[in-house]
């Protein structure tokens, strides 16, 4: 999923059948265990088709039949009305009729809202965290396929990270030359020019041609409408475009909503955006930083492509020498920022800024710390970057031209608050820009608090 900028996904991942042409009467036997998103997509497509043909009540009975075709190992179908009332959930039958619209995952995501938004576009993938009953109720990353049934409710099924590839791993192309940033920009601009000259239909046909001129090693094209529905996909993810998968609520392993973020950039004329790709380097899993570049074609659709940040391409063959590794977790930065926001709301702005400015204060844990900015991008407090206090950073970019503050604010306002940048570790008085996962949260309508963790996640 979202592997633009790589050479191919590893492991199983054949294209699923098209839900638009899947009838309830078509023969279908689910696999013993679902381990890939294409399998999950087909599973949900048949559930939606069955519900359309047989009606809600009969479908609810069928979905809970442990010996039926809508239970595959630990994967089952659930159905929810628009508005958040559960129609049926085979794994949790007691919640039928319950309103789940305000339920959140550990990072504050109202996942039912994300389900509903995606389902209204037809079908798509939604990322969230949920307790896995097969793993003692431990919260795990989960990806759900959701599909509208009749405009009043949707069906869905989810895949936990312990069951399969929620974030598919890829193989980096180590034999071909590594594209530079200017190659990426030129590639996307050439695709935009081609689309504007030749029209949408012809351009999408060429972009989706796995032997066509826009498949150039690591450089491959992805296209979306402004709802986040896929129009063109890499050769190794044909199910995305075949099934018109909506990805507006798909996020990367750190909760960064990649398509939503790039869509927002595209509406403003385009720009750079960071995500990560899961790479298996020898016996190690590394989440390697990737830089994407997006541009609008017109008012109907936009495109992007991406490359591994060049200095990290050597991770592919297993060279981890000198790679900055995280000392903290996403959970830690989320907790620290939320504690700082709560302190500010309880103690007032003056006390909070004084505490944030203290390098030995309660909101500093090594190179995990918080800072504060006003909504116009002016730095109000920082325990280490003292020369920035009072300066407006709204238009500041990293060395690749990615606007750090703007991206963070858009993530805070439109997604879940997580974004990425390349930034020096100021707690260690370093000047080299390294990958940083940032989390930001508003205190009130006038200012916000942010924190971040440096380095790459290595498993």
Residue spans of the language-model regions?
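N-terminal membrane-sensor/transducer module of prokaryotic signaling receptors
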Residues: 2-4, 15-459
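C-terminal region of N-terminal signal peptides and the immediate post-cleavage residues
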Residues: 6-10
């Amino acid at each position: 999923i979202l592997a633009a900028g790589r050479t191919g996904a590893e492991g199983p991942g054949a294209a699923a059948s098209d839900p638009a042409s899947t009838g309830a009467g078509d023969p279908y036997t689910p696999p013993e265990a679902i381990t890939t998103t294409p399998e999950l997509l087909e599973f949900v497509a048949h559930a939606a088709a069955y519900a359309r043909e047989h009606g809600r009540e009969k479908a609810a009975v069928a979905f809970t039949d442990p010996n039926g075709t809508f239970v595959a190992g630990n994967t089952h179908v659930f159905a929810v009305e628009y508005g958040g009332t559960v129609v049926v959930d085979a794994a949790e039958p007691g919640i039928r009729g319950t309103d789940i619209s305000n339920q959140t995952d550990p990072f504050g995501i109202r996942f039912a809202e994300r389900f509903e938004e995606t389902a209204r576009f037809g079908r798509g993938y939604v990322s969230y965290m949920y307790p896995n009953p097969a793993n003692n109720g431990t919260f795990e990353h989960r990806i759900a396929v959701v599909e509208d049934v009749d405009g009043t409710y949707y069906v869905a099924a989810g895949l936990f990270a312990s069951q399969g590839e929620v974030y598919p791993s890829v193989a980096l192309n180590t034999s071909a030359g590594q594209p530079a940033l200017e190659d990426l920009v030129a590639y996307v601009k050439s695709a935009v020019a081609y689309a504007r000259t030749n029209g949408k239909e012809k351009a999408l046909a060429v972009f989706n041609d796995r032997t066509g001129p826009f498949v150039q090693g690591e450089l491959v094209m992805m296209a979306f409408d402004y709802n986040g529905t896929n129009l063109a996909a890499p050769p190794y993810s044909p199910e995305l475009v075949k099934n018109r998968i909506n990805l507006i609520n798909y996020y990367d392993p750190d909760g960064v909503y990649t398509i939503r973020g790039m869509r927002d950039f595209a509406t403003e004329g385009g720009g750079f955006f960071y995500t990560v790709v899961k790479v298996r380097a020898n016996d190690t899993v590394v989440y390697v930083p990737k830089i994407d570049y997006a541009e609008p074609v017109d008012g109907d659709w936009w495109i992007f492509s991406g490359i591994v940040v060049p200095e990290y391409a050597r991770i592919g063959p297993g060279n981890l020498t000198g790679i900055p590794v995280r000392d903290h977790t996403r959970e830690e930065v989320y907790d620290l920022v939320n504690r700082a926001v709560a302190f500010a709301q309880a103690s007032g702005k003056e006390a909070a800024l004084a505490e944030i400015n203290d390098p030995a204060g309660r909101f500093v844990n090594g190179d995990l710390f918080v800072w504060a900015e006003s909504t116009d991008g002016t730095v109000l407090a920082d325990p280490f970057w003292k020369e920035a206090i009072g300066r407006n950073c709204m238009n500041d970019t990293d060395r690749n031209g990615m606007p750090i503050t703007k991206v963070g604010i858009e993530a805070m306002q439109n997604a879940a608050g997580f974004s990425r940048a390349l930034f020096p570790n100021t707690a260690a008085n370093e000047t080299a820009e390294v990958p940083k996962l940032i989390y930001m949260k508003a205190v009130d309508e006038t200012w916000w608090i942010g924190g971040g963790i440096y380095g790459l996640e290595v498993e």
